[in-house]
């Protein structure tokens, strides 16, 4: 049993069907939706601010999802919300565990889980696409190191600040006085407080995430036989930008050591390779990311 006890959520529901019942219209669905509600920060500011903005109760979401998956239904939407709750509560550790759980869920229950196949393949697909969007947004504001201000979103802000300063007649110093120091130099100073080992550890944690996503997608395409593509494209792109950003603050020799080699799916060559049957390894191999790098926001600004 792992730390988050996700293995117990994969045991069959006691009753006539291992997948339990359809709970789409069960009150627990609405209860989880309500617990996930989180008003944006701007709603607590300004003249028309909401006095008590809603804040998501992720512990409640996690508990409700666990009880439901264990005792009532093997539901894909509930599973996606569960992954989201672990991520929100435990950051990268929770995300790793959640993605591992989702891969096993799809492997074991895809043929019988809810929503049923009769509702159409696009219904299930949409649940995964929405999770992709939610995870991508979370990662953009996820602290890359212990400092909560060191995020991909803050890096974007620093690049925008530099661009604005280059166009401002008043110059960077005046901009800092009026808006605060959001410069690239200030961002680099914040990262500079951490040693190479810490940055390298974080780099590797983020670099491991695509492998977890590969497993989910390989199980999905193994069952659906759809044309292979990246379901979690947004999450992958955000992870790529994060690892590229972290690598900027590592010496070249450490970057070379941390470089992620291309996926190998030969039997026994990887942990994942040992767990997938031969036919499914072909699906896993097809998910190997291209070596062509997409244009980042920084490159676009430079041009």
Where are these regions (language model features)?
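Structural motif
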Residues: 70-77
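Polyanionic, low-complexity intrinsically disordered segments
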Residues: 1-55, 74, 93-96, 100-303
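Flexible helix-coil transition and linker loops at the boundaries of alpha-helical arrays
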Residues: 68-69, 116
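Amphipathic alpha-helices of TPR/Sel1-like and other helical repeat/solenoid scaffolds
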Residues: 60-68
């Amino acid at each position: 049993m792992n730390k988050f006890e996700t293995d117990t959520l994969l045991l069959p529901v006691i009753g006539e069907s291992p997948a339990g019942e359809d709970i789409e219209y069960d009150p627990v669905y609405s209860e989880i939706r309500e617990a996930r509600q989180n008003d944006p920060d701007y709603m607590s500011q300004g003249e028309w601010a909401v006095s008590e903005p809603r804040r998501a109760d992720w512990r409640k979401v996690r508990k409700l999802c666990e009880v439901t998956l264990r005792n009532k239904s093997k539901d894909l939407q509930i599973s996606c919300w569960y992954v989201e709750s672990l991520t929100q509560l435990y950051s990268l550790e929770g995300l790793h565990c959640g993605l591992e759980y989702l891969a096993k869920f799809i492997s074991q229950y895809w043929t019988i889980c809810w929503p049923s196949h009769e509702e159409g393949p696009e219904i299930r697909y949409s649940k995964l696409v929405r999770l992709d969007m939610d995870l991508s947004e979370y990662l953009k504001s996820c602290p890359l190191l212990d400092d909560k201000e060191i995020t991909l979103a803050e890096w974007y802000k620093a690049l925008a600040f530099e661009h604005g300063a280059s166009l401002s007649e008043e110059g960077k110093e005046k901009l800092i006085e009026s808006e605060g120091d959001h410069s690239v130099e200030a961002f680099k100073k914040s990262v500079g407080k951490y040693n190479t080992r810490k940055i390298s550890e974080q780099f590797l944690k983020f670099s491991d995430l695509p492998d977890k996503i590969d497993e989910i997608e390989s199980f999905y395409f193994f069952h659906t036989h759809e044309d292979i593509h990246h379901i979690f494209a947004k999450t992958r792109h955000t992870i790529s930008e994060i690892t590229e950003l972290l690598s900027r603050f590592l010496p070249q020799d450490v970057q070379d050591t941390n470089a992620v080699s291309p996926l190998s799916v030969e039997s026994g060559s990887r942990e994942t390779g040992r767990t997938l049957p031969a036919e499914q390894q072909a699906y896993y191999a097809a998910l190997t990311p291209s070596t062509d790098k997409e244009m980042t926001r920084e490159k676009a600004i430079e041009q």
